[in-house]
């Protein structure tokens, strides 16, 4: 089994900072890369990131804006938003001269290409060994060392297991998998479904409706996963059902918070990127290409595109023909 002694986290937002703390707790030599030199200097000197207030960065984490320095690490965690993943890996590609694990830590599908995160990595960097980290996790919880469990998947089981050994600790428990596509579908779909759950809360439709929406949403996620060859245990595991339950239950989820705002007729929360808003139309197109029925996801995409009002979407879902549960 390969041992990874050094880890670089690309992206010094809240999630990137939390992952740097994870790697440091696991005993790795950690570099946190920030695109903005001033931002990097501030974090390095104060050991505080304004994007993750109240969390003090471990003293041995190196913070830099020099990409070449970060790229020397044994493994790379890409903590940029999904739609910026290709740009980040493109920048890294010329610095990666040997097989190096490149782990996507964002949940989504690339616009335009309809590529999943590991596919983007494989295209953008010749020597990258693509992997995906996903599951029920909030940056604040992870950074503070609260117990968290996630899934880390790569095509080769030995690589996935080695990555888990490199990042795991008593408070951060990754489970390894080779079902890369199943993990990616769970993370992408749950973001869209969390927006729908937030709309239910914003519209004050009640706890029963929220439970029904979450359950039927999982049915959509599972149908798409099966159509794409995902394993049932992945879809019902941490990166599928687990992440869906978390994202549909608290406004800490940016997608859930966006849904609440939409349901109340308010503006979207300022400065909060909700990946589900970008993923919704791509997810619906992916489902259509595989002849998978995803009415909740379709409703979210239509609402976000101003093609359907929330009231019309709710009525449409509630008046669908009765059928057997699946």
Curated annotation (Swiss-Prot):
Record-annotated active site: 190
Keywords: Cytoplasm, Lipid biosynthesis, Lipid metabolism, NAD, NADP, Nucleotide-binding, Oxidoreductase, Phospholipid biosynthesis, Phospholipid metabolism
Chain positions recorded as sn-glycerol 3-phosphate binding sites: 107, 135, 137, 190, 243, 253-255
Transmembrane regions listed in the UniProt entry: none
Domain of life, per lineage: Bacteria
PANTHER family the record matches: GLYCEROL-3-PHOSPHATE DEHYDROGENASE, GLYCEROL-3-PHOSPHATE DEHYDROGENASE [NAD(+)] 2, CHLOROPLASTIC
Protein name as catalogued: Glycerol-3-phosphate dehydrogenase [NAD(P)+]
């Amino acid at each position: 089994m390969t041992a990874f002694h050094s880890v670089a986290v690309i992206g010094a937002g809240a999630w990137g900072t939390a992952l740097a703390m994870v790697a440091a707790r696991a005993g790795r030599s950690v570099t946190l890369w920030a695109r903005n030199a001033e931002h990097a200097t501030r974090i390095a000197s104060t050991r505080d990131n304004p994007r993750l207030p109240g969390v003090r960065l471990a003293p041995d984490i190196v913070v830099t804006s020099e990409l070449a320095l970060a790229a020397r690490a044994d493994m790379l965690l890409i903590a940029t938003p999904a739609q910026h993943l290709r740009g980040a890996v493109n920048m890294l590609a010329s610095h990666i001269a040997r097989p190096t694990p490149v782990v996507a830590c964002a949940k989504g599908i690339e616009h335009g290409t309809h590529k999943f995160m590991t596919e983007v990595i494989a295209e953008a960097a010749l020597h990258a060994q693509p992997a995906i980290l996903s599951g029920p996790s909030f940056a604040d919880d992870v950074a503070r060392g609260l117990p968290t469990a996630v899934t880390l998947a790569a095509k080769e089981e030995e690589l996935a297991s080695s990555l888990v050994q490199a990042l795991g600790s008593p408070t951060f428990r990754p489970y390894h998998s080779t079902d890369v596509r199943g993990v990616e579908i769970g993370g992408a779909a749950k973001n869209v479904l969390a927006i729908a759950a937030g709309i239910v809360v914003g519209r004050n439709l009640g706890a029963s409706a929220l439970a029904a929406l979450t359950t039927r949403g999982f049915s959509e996620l599972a149908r798409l996963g099966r159509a794409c060859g995902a394993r049932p245990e992945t879809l019902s595991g941490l990166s599928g059902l687990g992440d869906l339950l978390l994202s549909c239950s608290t406004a800490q989820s940016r997608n859930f918070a966006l849904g609440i705002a939409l349901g109340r007729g308010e503006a979207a929360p300022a400065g909060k990127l909700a990946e589900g808003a970008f993923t919704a139309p791509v997810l619906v197109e992916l489902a259509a290409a595989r002849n998978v029925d995803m009415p909740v996801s379709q409703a979210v995409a239509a609402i976000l595109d101003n093609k359907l009002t929330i009231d019309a979407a709710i009525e449409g879902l509630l008046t669908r023909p009765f059928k057997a549960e699946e």
